């Protein structure tokens, strides 16, 4: 009887562990509600973290770019474009990857700019203000700021950091006898620079950002 009782306890324990693992897997696969998850860490580079609040600009920007293409492809059902398989995976996954790569790129050059004491001039400030106006207008037209849970101040902070990053990217390129575009996030010289850094993407959080359905509603249509 004691042996049977012990076996029963072990079997129950195994079942409970399997149920917990299954529940965790389902949670990790479930899209998160972006505006409720702003403090979640999406990535880290050189001991600096990027939360979903920090990533919000990139989500809004990348979704807008892809949505314009999706509406050309199929105005009635843009989700078809977002769900399309392309080089590198499905379009929504590629968009997610691109947004993260842009954010890591800008954060790295921002860190380097701060280390070198880079300052913004009046032209930089004007360009930054124009970029903020364009982004915020596009975002609020689709009520994206509500979906992302960010304020204009949050967007301005990110765009300002991007301005510093872009300015130092130009300086860094000149120092290495390269062009500005050589250090775009897709290019080999930048990728080699990135490999020298200590960085990590928190895929448990980032993969739950449902690109195409954060600031837009591109749910699959029923037949």
Model-identified regions with their sequence ranges:
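Short, low-structural-confidence N-terminal segments
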Residues: 1-91, 191-223
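Alpha-helical scaffold segments that flank or form the walls of functional sites
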Residues: 97-100
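Charged, solvent-exposed helices and adjacent loops that form client-binding or oligomerization surfaces
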Residues: 65-95, 114-185
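Solvent-exposed helix-coil-helix hairpins and adjacent flexible coil/strand "hinge" segments
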Residues: 172, 181-182, 186-195, 202
